[in-house]
Amino acid sequence: MALPLRPLTRGLASAAKGGHGGAGARTWRLLTFVLALPSVALCTFNSYLHSGHRPRPEFRPYQHLRIRTKPYPWGDGNHTLFHNSHVNPLPTGYEHP
């Protein structure tokens, strides 16, 4: 015999009809100001402390990297579209700044 669904739906409808949030909204506001914002500030401060300039690694001309079978259609044909001369080496090595 099938159970009637009416008592189940009424229970859910009456629970949704009550106060909206109340203590739950206060709890999340408290968690935001006590946990989330200080955590973001701490992570920001940590990344600021570790943001020093690091020397770039020694260039090693691996055969499987930086393969140019035909030149790029922009610039001199050897630089990629978003080439950064500070971190991206060319097939012959790093560019001198």
Curated annotation (Swiss-Prot):
It is linked to Mitochondrial complex IV deficiency, nuclear type 18: An autosomal recessive, muscle-specific, mitochondrial disorder with onset in infancy. MC4DN18 is characterized by hypotonia, limb and facial muscle weakness, and high arched palate. Some patients have respiratory insufficiency at birth and cardiomyopathy. Patient skeletal muscle shows decreased levels and activity of mitochondrial respiratory complex IV. It is a single-pass membrane protein. Changing residue 43 to R: In MC4DN18; reduced complex IV assembly; decreased COX6A2 protein stability. Keywords: Disease variant, Membrane, Mitochondrion, Mitochondrion inner membrane, Oxidoreductase, Primary mitochondrial disease, Transit peptide, Transmembrane, Transmembrane helix. Component of the cytochrome c oxidase, the last enzyme in the mitochondrial electron transport chain which drives oxidative phosphorylation. The respiratory chain contains 3 multisubunit complexes succinate dehydrogenase (complex II, CII), ubiquinol-cytochrome c oxidoreductase (cytochrome b-c1 complex, complex III, CIII) and cytochrome c oxidase (complex IV, CIV), that cooperate to transfer electrons derived from NADH and succinate to molecular oxygen, creating an electrochemical gradient over the inner membrane that drives transmembrane transport and the ATP synthase. It comes from the Eukaryota. SUPFAM superfamilies: Mitochondrial cytochrome c oxidase subunit VIa. The gene is COX6A2. This is Cytochrome c oxidase subunit 6A2, mitochondrial. Its main location: mitochondrion. PANTHER family: CYTOCHROME C OXIDASE POLYPEPTIDE VIA, CYTOCHROME C OXIDASE SUBUNIT 6A2, MITOCHONDRIAL. Residues 1-12 form a transit peptide. It is found in: Mitochondrion inner membrane. GO terms for cellular component: mitochondrial inner membrane; mitochondrion; respiratory chain complex IV. The chain crosses the membrane at residues 25-49. Pathway: Energy metabolism; oxidative phosphorylation.
